[in-house]
Structures are given as structure tokens and as C-alpha cells.
Amino acid sequence: MSSGQSFSHSLLKLPLSALVKGTAIPSNPIDDHHIDINKPIVYALPFRSAVDLLTLQKHALELGLPDPLSPLEIHGKSLKRYVFIASRPTLVQSDNDVPSDSIALFSDLLALHAEDSELDVQVIPATVLWGRKPGKEGNNKPYLQAMNGLQKAKAVITAGRDCLVRFSPVVSLRYMAQSHGTDSSIAHKLARVARIHFSRQKLAASGPDLPSRQVLFARLMKSPAIEQAIEEEAKSKNISMEKARKEAQDIMDEIAADFSYSLVKQGDRLLGWLWNKLYQGLNINNAATVRRLAQDGHEIVYVPCHRSHMDYLLLSYVLYHEGMVPPHIAAGINLNFFPAGPIFRRGGAFFIRRSFKGNRLYSTIFREYLAELFAKGYSVEYFSEGGRSRTGRLLPAKTGMLAMTIQAMLRGLNRPVTLVPVYIGYEHVMEVATYAKELRGKRKEKENAGLVLRTLRKLRNFGLGYVNFGEPIPLNQYLNEHAPEWTKDIDPMGASRPQWINPVVNQLANKMMTHINDAAAANALTLCATALLASRQRALSKDSLIHQIECYLQLLKNVPYSKTYTVPSESAEALVEHAISLDKFVIETDTMGDIISLDRNQSILMTYYRNNIIHLFALPSLIAQMIIRQENLTVSQIQQQVAEIYPFLKAELFLSHKEEELDELVVKVLNELVSQDLISLKADKVAKNQANTLTLVLLGRTISETLQRYSIAFNLLVSNPELAKADLEQKSQDIAQRLTRLHGINAPEYFDKGVFASLFSTLKQQGYLDSDGNCDSEKTAQFATLLYALLYPEVKLTIEESVFQLKSA
């Protein structure tokens, strides 16, 4: 570096340190991008800019990366550690050519690779973005453009606190040299590729240009589908075309978002304060996968589970802080009340009625609006379950939005569309007490400003929040596999609804929900709730609770559930202490130590948190229950019984393991139970270890309530094979409700109608009922006997008596 450059850099550092507070994306690029700091590193920046270079230097050093201003020494040659892909324009000219010194550096590096087969220089593309405000539609400026000195000074002053430093995945010059050679033309190609890459980085951070709402509405009104719907509306209601158009305009105004970057920017500060007040921290996992999709130009559709109204804010906040554009969010029309509605709308929410069946004009406009969002490249978010889960379990997907997404693809989108399942978890859900009341029959309170204010008064520390991005589902690839000729149905007019859509959407919905559950986050509260609710008295000594949590942790770590779920890194003791700090348990002390318990009200509320992760333990719990309730089992018998019961658990809990994987999985679970000294395995015989029976019993009881529900339904069918679907569901509910009173079962979902409706579908899929609803009596009786063997005697007796009474009535 020349003395002049060194002096100018020194002059710039002081004002930059005061004005610039940037955010590095990702926050840990060494791990996220698998950067090997022992190999030579060169940074590539889009434009010649001392300000950008110094901003990059500050963040690189903070992140443990080499100083971009330090020389790179290779085989006795001293080289620059940074390159600019384009020259900085002055006030009177603009130069988009690649600087000659950058080409020279690339050429030198490629030549060194030709001489040394072991050399591998890592090029890290780095973009310094000053503000993330999207452009306006109709403005034909490039997404990323250089600034002259005055423009850069203004950007530093106005957007220095909104600066992003994006580190992209490394480009291996060894790979480039081996794949494309080492002549000088490759240096030019490398620079051109980098320029495209930088534009995508800006697009991923700011999003597409935004239209004014009136321009958007005018464009939608010219849609042939909407024009036809308006004509039909006028005819069917016998009103004028002008009145029908006004009705269409009103519907558009009701639906459409009015995205405001300034509100998002200001809201980020408010949300930052809110999360710090509410939560001790946010754990975010697998965001790098989503960033890659955004950078590669995918149309991203976020499909999170729905726990709380907080979900709307949390996911947008997380995406913004991960350097991505907050999505346009499908929100229920019930949230369109003052003042929340206008704020949500400017934050990207578009509103959807709970039902618009039979309203052709509304459904057409909504479908066209959604297709417009996809066509323009805006990321979209809709909640897969339709509404918030009141039980903590993942609900079956509502498929309407998913079907409209597929229909939008049939317009001929020119970008790949990818679903990104998202698991959202909390150690405290603000509405959980309300959910319990609603499940007991209390009418849902309509959302309003008063409800918001009452909620805000309850703000306190709610522990940790979790956002886990699941395995993406590329829709183009999915359709290629499940509807190979789908491209033949592409119709730019949007009239296509081929016959294959419904079955494909139903399969896709199930896959989507499974991927959400695959990304579950176990945490201190969900684990402690699972253990305490498995105890008959909802109480355990502190030592027993710690021991049980340790059992869960070892199972989750040693028998992995999926690639995307997360397990706490803390010890069992630390997790129990953290859960106690959340003030949800009753703590009593005697001469032998602390006893941790749940009162009746908290027992009901804790089922919500247990249900968040019950699927993670479904199979280990089932195996433990088999060992506890049956003597002298062999491994093969356990495998056979698991194979019979698993399809019901898989359908209800969206489990991901395939049936052909079960035998191997059973062996892995058994081996883990052996390593924990809970059971012994001798000559294929399984026996429980009497010294550690409590841990095994608690593990088994996690799934016992689910098995009880199955037993109720199957014993009703054995008693009366001709029961119709509605009767089976109602009688099952009645018996389940009776069991809750007689046996102190506090789970509100225990007699939920939806659970029994799902069970009925699985009965048909597994051949216990044929397509006409006729029962296979022998098969049903055998399965009922198996389920009975897994129940405790007192529960078994209540089911027998209840079935007999209903039959006699």
C-alpha cells in the first residue's frame, strides 16, 4: 500500500468509526462458509472504494478473518489481499471496466496455481451495502451500482447504521484453475461472474423494486381473469359494471400489502427492544441454507408452524437480521383492526378471509394478487396450519394457499420456487392460557386493540425463542417427480387446474409438515414438561428430573431424529435450573432435597410445551412402553409391534422415518437404552434393568396417552364393527373425556375431535376399514389386543367398562 493510501485510510477511520455500525452476514462466516483460515484468502469487492474496504477490514478482524489490508505472501511474492471488480465512477464519468490491477492480481494468482498443485487461494466475495431500501418499480437503475465520493459520503451519513457486510461462500481458485485453466481470459471471466454475484447479493438483501399500490391495482384490473370475474359479478348480482369494478377495487384494497421500508427499519429497533425485554435470547439455525436460495434467485415461500401471534413479527425480524428481505405475509383478516392492521400491512402483511368459498370475485382477485407477488419475485410467507395450534402439536396443513402456489407456477414463472419449512418454538407462549380455555369450550375472543394492550401489560422475561429453518422443498423438482408432465399444463392466463393438483398438493402438504417437525428445537422447558407430565403425580425429585433430562439428551444426540432438529448443548442440570428460573414449577424442599411439581393449572399448560417435541420421542417412548408392559420380548417382536403401530403415529405426529428404516432404528434405540443401563440385551432377549426402572417408565409414559386413544377407537370397532365414521369419532371422544376425569389426564387435546378424525383416515389407509367403511374384524381385534397389552390395568378396565356401557345403551 502506498503512503498516500495509508494516510487517506487513517483520515477515514475516525469518522467511519463514529458513523458506521454495520452488521456482518453471516455472523460466523468461518463456520457457515467452511473457510479454512490456514489457506491464503483474498477478498473481492464490487467497486473501488476506500470506505467499503475499511468497513470490510473492521468486520473481518472482528470475525477472526485476515486483515484485507495486510499483504498476502505466497512463495516469496507479496500480493494485495483484495481486488475490486469495477472502478469507482467520478462525478463526470462512469467506468464499468474491471480495473487492470485486479485482472493482474487474478492472473498472478492463477499463474501461481499453475506452478504449485497444492496451492488453493480462497476468494471471498464481500459486499458492503449502504442501506437496504428497495427501488421503485419503473426505475431502471441496476440493483447494485457504484457511488461517487459525494454519494458515498451521503450514504455513510444517512445509512451508516443500516450497513450490511455480506460474506459470500468462498470461490476456490484451485477449483477454477483445474476446471477452466489458468490463462488471462479466466481472470476476466472470474470478474464477470463476481459482478453478477454482487447484484444478486443486493437483490437478496433489498428485494425487487416496489410498485405503488395504485399501479399494482391498475395492472391487476387489466388481468383477463379479473375482468371476466367482474363481468360475472355484475351479471349474477344484477349491478352495473362500474359498481362491480368498485367492489373489485375494494377487495384489492382489503387484501394488498403496502410495504414500507422505513417502517420495517424503524420497527426493527422496536422489535429489538421487545425481544430483549421478552426473551433471554433467540436461537436461529440453518439460515445459511435460505440465504443461498435467495442469492441463487429462488422464489422463496416460507411455511412456518403457527404457535403465537408473535410468529408474524419474529420470523420477519430474524430474516431481516440474517440479511434477507422480510416476506409478504398472509395474515388472517381478523388481524386487520386499528392500529395493528395498518402497521402489519406496511410491514408486508396481506390479508386473507377465513373462507371465500363461493365468492368468485374475491377468490379470483386473491389468486391473481398472489400470482403477481410470485411473478415479481417477492418472498411470501403463509402459515401451514392456517391458524395457531391450540395444543402445541402440529396441525394438519390447510392446502388452499399451497394449491394457489402451484397454480401460480402454472403461469410459467421463470424462477424456481422453493418451500422453506420453519419451526418456531418458545419457552413461553403468551396465549397458552387462552388456548387452554378455548379447548375447554370458551369462545375465542376477537382480536382488538384492548386485547393487545392487555397482552402488553403481561410482558416479562419469557426465556428463549427458537427459529429453525427446515430442509427446503424445491417445488419444480417435486413436480417433476410427482407430476412429470406438469409443464404441459402451463397456461399464462391462469385458467389451468389440472386433475393431478389435488393429490399432489395433499402429498406435498404432508411432506411440508414433516419437514417442519424435522426441524424441531428441544429446549429446557419442553424437556422438563415432558418428564414431569410423565409422572403420575406430576412431580419428581430434582435429582430424578435431572436424570430423566439426561436420558432425553442422550437419546436425541445418539439416535438422531433428523438433519435439521436441534438439541441443547447445556448439561441436564443447567437445563433444569434454567427451566426453574422461568417460574412455572412448584418447588418444595424436604430433608432429602427439592421436589419439583406442577399444579393442576400448570399441568394443563405444560402439555402445550410437551406437545411441541412429543414427536421426537414417539419411537423411543413406544419401545420403552413395550418393554415396561411386556415380559420376555425379543428384538424381532419389538420390531414387529413397532411396524404395526408406527403408521398411526407417523400420520398423527408427522414423523419422518420411512417404514423400511424402522428395524434398524429400533436396534439403535435399544442399543442406546443399553448404553444408558436402562435395559439389557442377551441372546436377542430384552429385559429392563430394575435399578433404573423409573427412567424407563417415564420415557414410556410420554406416548401412553396416544396409545390409549388408539385403544379406545379399536375396542369400539371390535365391539361394533359397523360403527359409522361420525359415531366412531363421537363415541371415542366420549370415552376419552371420561378417562380424563377418572384418571387425572390433563391434556386438553386428549379428546380433541381432530385427533380422532385423523385416526379414522389412517384406519382406511392401513386396511382396517375398506373404502366403504367396512371393518376387517380379525385384523382389528389383533391390533386391539396389542394395544391393550401396552396399557396400564386401571386404564384398560375403564375402556372396557365404557365400551360395554355404550354398546348396552
Swiss-Prot record:
GO biological process terms held by the UniProt record: CDP-diacylglycerol biosynthetic process; fatty acid metabolic process
Major enzyme class: transferase
InterPro entries: GPAT/DHAPAT (IPR022284), GPAT/DHAPAT_C (IPR045520), GPAT/DHAPAT_LPLAT (IPR041728), GPAT_PlsB (IPR028354), Plipid/glycerol_acylTrfase (IPR002123)
Pathway in which the depicted protein is active: Phospholipid metabolism; CDP-diacylglycerol biosynthesis; CDP-diacylglycerol from sn-glycerol 3-phosphate: step 1/3
Molecular function in Gene Ontology: glycerol-3-phosphate O-acyltransferase activity
GO cellular component: plasma membrane
CDD domains: LPLAT_DHAPAT-like
Membrane topology: Peripheral membrane protein
UniProt xrefs under Pfam families: Acyltransferase, GPAT_C
EC number: 2.3.1.15
UniProt-annotated location(s): Cell inner membrane
Domain of life: Bacteria
Keyword Lipid biosynthesis: yes
Motif HXXXXD motif in this chain: 306-311
UniProt keywords, alphabetically: Acyltransferase, Cell inner membrane, Cell membrane, Lipid biosynthesis, Lipid metabolism, Membrane, Phospholipid biosynthesis, Phospholipid metabolism, Transferase
Chief location of this protein within or outside the cell: membrane
Reactions catalysed according to its record: sn-glycerol 3-phosphate + an acyl-CoA = a 1-acyl-sn-glycero-3-phosphate + CoA
Similarity comment: Belongs to the GPAT/DAPAT family.
Domain remarks: The HXXXXD motif is essential for acyltransferase activity and may constitute the binding site for the phosphate moiety of the glycerol-3-phosphate.
Protein name as annotated: Glycerol-3-phosphate acyltransferase
Taxon lineage: Bacteria, Pseudomonadati, Pseudomonadota, Gammaproteobacteria, Vibrionales
